[in-house]
């Protein structure tokens, strides 16, 4: 009898973990800013982050088709540096570039992977716009908004529990350069690291898209995530919308896992942000 109940318990546990790690949630945020050109009212941005080689076998693509975004932004860690599988990432990329223009910045796993050059080549084949340390304008009906991207600071090959001063200086240096002569009033930043919101808010940035935190990996109802890289226990920025000063930030819980192999009360997530102006 004890063996029977043990088997039932283990089976139920595995079923629960499989559900928690594969049932993709769609989180929608409405973002309003009077600096946004009227032409961008209702502009829909789909945010993908932290795939870490995970395969969803078409289910993710079907959800994205139904969302029907105007653009797709990816904030890093498409691959996992410990078990890199570029093909898994490119299977998703090949599908989503047919849905909407796709913009990408690197995460720490790309920057620390010996396969990153190959990944960039593959992304380029599918016309994914690499936004690492780059600025561009998105045009809609003659109006424009700015899109800025920064490479993950692990480009300095320095991965520690907390970002080093050199890495923070790198981010500040790149943002100083990229925001120096902006031609757009409303500007979006793509950056893998949410813990640097206090840095981003010092620049002419209205909305940030970020990932990296994996939702805190295990979430406790009413308390939130338990642990995130570079933020430690009970991270402040593990999911959802945050605001400091005039800068708002959308943090994705991500889609895959890295060192820790499963999520609890923290399903994989697609984030949708719908823009609107005050008028």
What are the functions of these language-model segments?
Residues 35-36, 117-207, 238-241, 245-278:
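Conserved catalytic scaffold of divalent metal-dependent phosphoesterases
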Residues 45-47, 71-73, 103, 147-149, ...:
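Structural motif
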Residues 82, 140-142, 158-159, 217-224:
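Short, charged, surface-exposed secondary-structure boundary motifs
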């Amino acid at each position: 009898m004890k063996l029977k109940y043990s088997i039932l318990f283990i089976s139920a546990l595995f079923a629960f973990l499989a559900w928690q790690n594969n049932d993709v949630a769609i989180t929608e945020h409405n973002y309003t800013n009077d600096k946004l050109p009227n032409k961008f009212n209702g502009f829909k941005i789909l945010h993908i982050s932290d795939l870490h080689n995970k395969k969803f076998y078409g289910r993710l693509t079907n959800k994205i088709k139904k969302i029907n975004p105007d653009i797709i932004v990816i904030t890093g860690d498409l691959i996992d540096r410990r078990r890199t599988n570029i093909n898994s990432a490119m299977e998703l990329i090949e599908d989503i570039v047919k849905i909407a223009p796709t913009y990408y910045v690197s995460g720490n796993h790309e920057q620390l992977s010996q396969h990153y050059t190959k990944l960039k080549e593959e992304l380029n084949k599918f016309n994914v716009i690499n936004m690492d340390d780059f600025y561009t304008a998105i045009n809609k009906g003659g109006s424009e908004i700015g899109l800025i991207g920064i490479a993950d600071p692990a480009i300095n090959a320095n991965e520690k529990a907390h970002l080093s001063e050199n890495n923070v200086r790198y981010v500040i240096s790149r943002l100083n350069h990229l925001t120096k002569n902006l031609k757009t009033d409303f500007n979006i930043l793509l950056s893998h690291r949410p813990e640097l919101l206090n840095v981003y808010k010092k620049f002419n940035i209205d909305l940030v898209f970020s990932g990296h935190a994996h939702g805190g990996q295990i979430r406790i109802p009413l308390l939130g995530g338990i642990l995130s890289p570079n933020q430690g226990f009970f991270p402040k920025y593990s999911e959802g919308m945050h605001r400091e000063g005039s800068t708002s930030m959308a943090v994705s819980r991500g889609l895959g896992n890295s060192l820790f192999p499963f999520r609890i009360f923290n399903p994989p997530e697609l984030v949708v942000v719908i823009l609107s102006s005050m008028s």
